Amino acid sequence: MTTQLEQAWELAKQRFAAVGIDVEEALRQLDRLPVSMHCWQGDDVSGFENPEGSLTGGIQATGNYPGKARNASELRADLEQAMRLIPGPKRLNLHAIYLESDTPVSRDQIKPEHFKNWVEWAKANQLGLDFNPSCFSHPLSADGFTLSHPDDSIRQFWIDHCKASRRVSAYFGEQLGTPSVMNIWIPDGMKDITVDRLAPRQRLLAALDEVISEKLNPAHHIDAVESKLFGIGAESYTVGSNEFYMGYATSRQTALCLDAGHFHPTEVISDKISAAMLYVPQLLLHVSRPVRWDSDHVVLLDDETQAIASEIVRHDLFDRVHIGLDFFDASINRIAAWVIGTRNMKKALLRALLEPTAELRKLEAAGDYTARLALLEEQKSLPRQAVWEMYCQHHDTPAGSEWLESVRAYEKAILSQRG
């Protein structure tokens, strides 16, 4: 530890102590909050089932920055490089299309054995794993419907895929000793005016009930469902709307996934957390950055990211909220994208932990909104960077932008060889 960092740390401890904050306790609490990194930033959601196929489902990864991962070994190596530059606990979020097999595997036939390499890798790197069925980029999703498909056989195919995915998820949790959160998102919807909005939702309701009918150990597996406002090619009607999934998660007591990009641009998920928590047992968050639509830009340390983190901390939702990231930018170095977005999420959580929330609550309860606003703004000037740098020091990761040097070196030595 440098003398300069020691001095800054001691000063920060004193400054925060003056407003009632124990910075060492804040760092301990931050280590209770793993962030689940999404594997698909590393290869633009290509997966290993059909890497040359088109990305469908109303989502897009734009850009052609060189060096994307082409196989599981490259993707795991890239993830390791990114994780070395991110302090604190992490998880990895996998999609079903990231299976490994020497022969083609139909999605309704995926098994734990197709993900055993991921589990062994997670054990070696002390990571938890989360999971997702992949209901897109497939011939049987080409017409825009999966779990709500009017064709019984196609709908059953996707039901069976989600059932198989739940067993993979439970395998993750059993092997790694931490529950896997499995999130169901489907692209189902219509491009133009829809006459019958009810029937697809009735089919989706019945399909989901069949999917979750097998009882799994909650210590190993957690079901989550995710809504969306619209997607490309599904601008007019989305079967799995917010109201549908809020009702489903409430009535079936599953987890509810809130994705920062899946609502109207004037809506924010930070305002939805406290409302949803009154009705559902757990939340899964997909922290993202929508620019005019669900563009999945890299997460910034912006007002909404901070507001999301503050909601988790202010309401002590550590054990009920699962923090995941969901962005994929192919226009910049993909490892840097992971590092920037994940570090920003962790910085936001730390800032929330350094807030004098108890004092702010007292002011709010007393109706002293002037002092509340004044204190909220003044605490932004406290030496939070020194605390972040000490946290990075504790976890042997770069504190400032020097992490970029490591990414550039890896790019030159490894990524540039991929073409």
UniProtKB/Swiss-Prot annotation:
<dbReference type="InterPro" id="IPR009308">
    <property type="entry name" value="Rhamnose_isomerase"/>
</dbReference>
<dbReference type="GO" id="GO:0019324">
    <property type="term" value="P:L-lyxose metabolic process"/>
</dbReference>
<keyword id="KW-0413">Isomerase</keyword>
<dbReference type="GO" id="GO:0008740">
    <property type="term" value="F:L-rhamnose isomerase activity"/>
</dbReference>
<dbReference type="InterPro" id="IPR036237">
    <property type="entry name" value="Xyl_isomerase-like_sf"/>
</dbReference>
<dbReference type="Pfam" id="PF06134">
    <property type="entry name" value="RhaA"/>
</dbReference>
<dbReference type="GO" id="GO:0019301">
    <property type="term" value="P:rhamnose catabolic process"/>
</dbReference>
<feature type="binding site">
    <location>
        <position position="296"/>
    </location>
    <ligand>
        <name>Mn(2+)</name>
    </ligand>
</feature>
<keyword id="KW-0684">Rhamnose metabolism</keyword>
<keyword id="KW-0479">Metal-binding</keyword>
<comment type="similarity">
    <text>Belongs to the rhamnose isomerase family.</text>
</comment>
<dbReference type="GO" id="GO:0005737">
    <property type="term" value="C:cytoplasm"/>
</dbReference>
<keyword id="KW-0963">Cytoplasm</keyword>
<feature type="binding site">
    <location>
        <position position="262"/>
    </location>
    <ligand>
        <name>Mn(2+)</name>
    </ligand>
</feature>
<keyword id="KW-0464">Manganese</keyword>
<protein>
    <recommendedName>
        <fullName>L-rhamnose isomerase</fullName>
        <ecNumber>5.3.1.14</ecNumber>
    </recommendedName>
</protein>
<feature type="binding site">
    <location>
        <position position="294"/>
    </location>
    <ligand>
        <name>Mn(2+)</name>
    </ligand>
</feature>
<dbReference type="GO" id="GO:0030145">
    <property type="term" value="F:manganese ion binding"/>
</dbReference>
<comment type="function">
    <text>Catalyzes the interconversion of L-rhamnose and L-rhamnulose.</text>
</comment>
<comment type="subunit">
    <text>Homotetramer.</text>
</comment>
<comment type="pathway">
    <text>Carbohydrate degradation; L-rhamnose degradation; glycerone phosphate from L-rhamnose: step 1/3.</text>
</comment>
<dbReference type="InterPro" id="IPR050337">
    <property type="entry name" value="L-rhamnose_isomerase"/>
</dbReference>
